[in-house]
Amino acid sequence: MSVSSLLQPNTYNINSKSQSLSNTPSNPTSQTNTLWSNNAYNPPHLMFGSSDLNNGTGPSGPKGDKGDPGSKGETGSQGIKGDPGVKGTTGGTIGSGTYFSGDLPSYVTTGGTETSIPEVSTGTVSFTTKTLGGNCNYSSGVFTTTETAAFYVAVTYIGTSVGSLSGSLTLSIFKNGGTAVYNTLVSYSGAGIQMSASLNGIIEMTPSDNIFIGFVNSGGEIQPNASGFTLNIFRI
């Protein structure tokens, strides 16, 4: 059987270009009229549906490289200069006076009188050492003077507790009564407790002023050691 008889009625004899075609479509390449196309310059190729086998959709390409950084922006313009501040006020006037120079002031340590000693605890205790300076008087714990001057007042106690009771010793310096100008408190507990208390300060005095030195022991009993009570009142 010949090839041409199998392809009738729309045939193309691939062995003879001179054979005529019968029942040829008006548009041999139209995909709606035939499954075959004929072209004198190209071999026949099969058409399927509405798409050519030569056409297809490939996969997406790889992601592109990152772009180069942008260029630096322009420098901003210079800010506006602020207004000058308000001028400060003029300082105060220069003070006048005499500068202190040399050694510290000397203390007058003689000239005072003492007539009695305050009591502490269970008996009268004398100051072991005492110094009164200037035109002053110390009587029954009260210090007075006939001068207008500053006085350095210092009181020291060194003693030992007696008995088993706890207690406390308070040393106070008052000026004209009222609240103590200087005050200190030392506590002790039991017998044979070594203790010390000291108090000192500078107080301005006039003939109408007085200084009271108070010794108050509460609770147990105390006795001064050999150095005992020391009282120093110096005029500056």
UniProtKB/Swiss-Prot annotation:
Region of interest called Disordered, as start-end residue ranges on this chain: 1-94
Similarity comment: Belongs to the sputnik virus V6 family.
Organism: Sputnik virophage
Protein name: Uncharacterized protein V7
Annotated Polar residues bias: 1-17
Origin organism lineage: Viruses, Varidnaviria, Bamfordvirae, Preplasmiviricota, Maveriviricetes
Skewed-composition ranges (Low complexity): 18-35
Domain Collagen-like: 58-91
Domain of life: Viruses
